[in-house]
Amino acid sequence: MPYPAALHIVPRGAARGSSTVVFVHGSLDRGESFRRVMRRLPELTTLAYDRRGYQGSRAGGIVGLGGHVDDLLCVADAAREDSGAPVVAVGHSLGGDVVVAAALASPHTFGAVGVYEPPMPWLGFRRAQTGTAGAWPPVSPDSGEEAERFFSRMVGPAAWSRLTDEGRAQRRADGPALVADLRSLHGEGPPFDVTQLEVPLVVGMGGPTTRPHHRRTVEWLGAHVSGAVVYEIEGAQHGAHLSHPDHFATLTRLVVDRVPTAAR
């Protein structure tokens, strides 16, 4: 079964008989951001992909959360058909929302799932109203401007300034997909009920310096999702897959270890 033609797949080798890990990136990111993590998992079959509308998958058009869920389920089905082994999905940031929603829609597809600091504003844990990490302003009607604003807010204005002209242009080109992501999470009601999740779950978060609303969300998930395991990466903040790839690889192994024996 082929992978969806509209998606740019980032594979990292294959380990015969092992589980397959599918990494799902967050907003204004790309599959390549997991490359350092995947290099640290030689015993597993791993792949990532650019979500539809981002980077190498821009030609696939713009979709909301439901479209990203459909894509992940197609990728997971293709991976399982290729290997015959269990598939687990690990999502960073909004990629975690995609993973949870997919596992709710099709529990039999995944042996286990992992998420790192998934934004779930409907739980009531929001960014602080004061300081540099203030609440999100309304989405800009200019998607390129929204991409610049999002990047500067998440990484820092200085980091935006350090990008090359091409780097800034690439982020702006991802603006329409970013806007669709933001609107997916800020609708009239919750897009899913995470407490109904039946697939084994590992929830990752950064250390004390990560943003408080991320920690509160992860702590809530650990307390309210049956059987969920919380894994803290000391010293990490939101971009742990980039800054702490060894620890993110450990989180991934925890997810694989949670696959029920009967499913292996």
Regions found by a protein language model. Give the residues of each.
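Active-site glycine-rich loops that stabilize anionic/oxyanionic intermediates
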Residues: 26-29, 93, 207
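Catalytic active-site module of serine/aspartate enzymes centered on a nucleophile-bearing elbow/loop
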Residues: 226-264
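Gly/Ala-rich beta-loop-alpha elbow adjacent to hydrolase catalytic centers
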Residues: 91-95, 99
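Conserved alpha/beta-hydrolase catalytic His-Asp/Glu region
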Residues: 143-180, 186
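Flexible "cap/lid" loop of the alpha/beta hydrolase fold
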Residues: 100-141
